[in-house]
């Protein structure tokens, strides 16, 4: 389940909003890590990623200068986590997007956005809900290729989020290559399957032409 949500400005890490009631979980370390991750983000970074942190996973979505984070249990489906973040992005951009990027914005200026976060989070708490399963099958972008990184690798071993973007790009390229190869193989198999019939048909036409002319 989604345990906590944070929204930050990508350019300077300014916290814009956060979920207020995070239950009994102590997520202070993961929240600090979200701030550190924001500092590492750049224009070349992957626009979405999952970062393993102990028993939890930090999912982020970076879009239009804003970074949306949700901290979930490690067993929570990534597809639901990113669908949740996509919904937050759509609503936040509609209501606060332009203002959030202005200079002089105070930290947590949009704390009232928590009302929408809490309402949306409740929809995504039950992974068995029909509504959620429909989203998995119809509305989601393809996040199966979203890279997963370990927080230790990212913060203490200097691994780059830009590298994650490169890996995602490579995966997309490889996927297209294999898809083209599969189409070629299917085409060749179809030719092998029907070429005897085509050959017989051509011979028959030739014999008919020979007899008539």
From Swiss-Prot:
Its membrane topology is listed as: Single-pass type IV membrane protein
Q: Which SMART domains match?
A: Longin
The Gene Ontology CC terms held by the record are: endoplasmic reticulum membrane; ER to Golgi transport vesicle membrane; Golgi membrane; SNARE complex
Residues on Cytoplasmic side: 1-192
Q: Which domain of life is it from?
A: Eukaryota
Q: Where is the v-SNARE coiled-coil homology domain?
A: 132-192
Q: Which GO terms describe its biological process?
A: endoplasmic reticulum to Golgi vesicle-mediated transport; intracellular protein transport; retrograde vesicle-mediated transport, Golgi to endoplasmic reticulum; vesicle fusion with Golgi apparatus
| Pfam families assigned | Longin (PF13774), Synaptobrevin (PF00957)
Q: Name one GO molecular function term.
A: SNAP receptor activity
Which key words are in the record? Coiled coil, Endoplasmic reticulum, ER-Golgi transport, Golgi apparatus, Membrane, Protein transport, Transmembrane, Transmembrane helix, Transport
Q: What is its main location?
A: membrane
Transmembrane stretches, by residue range? 193-213
Residue span(s) of domain Longin: 6-117
Please verify whether the record's keywords include Transmembrane helix.
yes
| Annotated family | Belongs to the synaptobrevin family.
Q: What is this protein called?
A: Protein transport protein SEC22
According to its UniProt entry, this protein's organism is Yarrowia lipolytica (strain CLIB 122 / E 150) (Yeast)
UniProt lists the gene as: SEC22
């Amino acid at each position: 389940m989604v345990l906590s949500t944070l929204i930050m400005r990508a350019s300077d890490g300014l916290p814009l909003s956060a979920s207020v009631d995070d239950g009994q979980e102590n997520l202070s370390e993961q929240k600090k890590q979200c701030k550190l991750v924001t500092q590492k983000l750049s224009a070349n970074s992957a626009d979405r990623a999952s970062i393993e942190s102990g028993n939890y996973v930090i999912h982020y979505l970076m879009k239009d200068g804003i970074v949306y984070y949700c901290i979930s249990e490690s067993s929570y489906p990534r597809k639901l986590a990113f669908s949740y973040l996509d919904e937050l992005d759509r609503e936040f951009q509609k209501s606060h997007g332009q203002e959030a990027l202005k200079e002089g914005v105070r930290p947590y200026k949009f704390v009232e956005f928590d009302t929408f976060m809490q309402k949306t989070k409740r929809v995504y708490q039950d992974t068995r809900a029909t509504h959620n399963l429909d989203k998995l099958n119809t509305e989601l972008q393809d996040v199966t290729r979203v890279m997963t990184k370990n927080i230790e690798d990212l913060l203490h071993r200097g691994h780059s989020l830009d590298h994650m973007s490169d890996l995602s790009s490579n995966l997309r390229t490889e996927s297209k290559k294999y898809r083209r190869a599969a189409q070629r193989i299917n085409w060749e198999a179809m030719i092998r399957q029907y070429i005897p019939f085509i050959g017989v048909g051509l011979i028959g036409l030739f014999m008919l032409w020979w007899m008539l002319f």
